[in-house]
Amino acid sequence: MSSVNQPKFIIFSQHGLSDTNSEMLSLAHKVAPPNSHIVAPNLGIVKTYFNIEPLVDKVEKYAVQAFEQYPNIPIRIIATSLGGVIWVEVLSRNREWWSEIESLVLLGSPIGGSDLARMIDPFGWGIGMAKYLGENRRPLAEKITAVISTLVVTGNTTGGSDGTVTIESTKLKHAHFVCVNGVSHPTLKSAPAVARAIQVFWEKPRKPLPAPNITIVSGLIGYFRTVQGITDANSADVQYAKIVHSFADGTTMRTWINGFGVYHVFIVNADRRCQYAGFVGWVHIAGLETAIEKAKKIF
């Protein structure tokens, strides 16, 4: 194909659960540089409620078609919610694409696992899309974010979530992070502040951020994220928690059991700001209690 007809960028824009491609297509047109080839697959509202595998296959197929049509063109990806989870799966299966991808933008994607999904399917029995949204894909995603320049954008309407997805579950090592106050989960696709954050991110080349310095807080966060059955929680609930241990640097570990018997753990820094929130279901409470006791000695 003549270089005259070649686009400057390929822009993928992927919608999420219970949605069509309309708003994500509109967002892509708002933020895309001139002469961009936009690909915004419509997965179908009903199909987003069940099995993730056909959705991953469909997005992957659209990607292959675009790459074959326009080889060696820089690629930018925008994905919201379930769409971000899908793209993490697609990229994990196609590592050879990573060098061609200029940036990845995730809008309110529960990569660490959705707390609502875990409540719907607490034992992972396979209740619709909850089975897949409740999974922790952070280990997969952080291999990607270490290589591909990534922006995470999350809304904040409750102090710890966008009303649907916890802020904690969207956080990834190496990713640039923007939290937009007053923006709910559904409006991430249309909020002017979100579109502007994407444009600013794209204005100049960005590199993946280095891993955070090792501190008691970062060590505790990494430690608790490995506890079996743990899911990122709403940090706003720290207001109900009690201190169970204080560390030498002023960091505190706090716990809370809600009205449904769900056991929470929080890490609060010396400035009294919650840095991590997680919870386990009933079957994993003993494991979390053991982890808390070990943390008191390890850190």
What is the role of each PLM region?
Residues V4-I10:
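A short, charged/proline- and glycine-enriched loop
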Residues I11-H15, S22, V31, H37-V153, ...:
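Serine-dependent carboxylesterase/thioesterase catalytic core
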Residues L27-A28:
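Typically the conserved alpha-helix immediately C-terminal to a functionally engaged Cys/Sec
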Residues Y49-F50, S184-P192, H264:
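Catalytic histidine-centered segment of alpha/beta-hydrolase-like enzymes
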Residues P54, K189-E203:
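Post-His helix in hydrolase/transferase enzymes
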Residues G159-P186:
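Active-site-adjacent alpha-helix of alpha/beta-hydrolase-fold enzymes
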Residues E203-P212:
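Short, charged low-complexity linker/loop segments at the C-terminal edge of domains
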Residues P212-F299:
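Extended non-globular C-terminal regions
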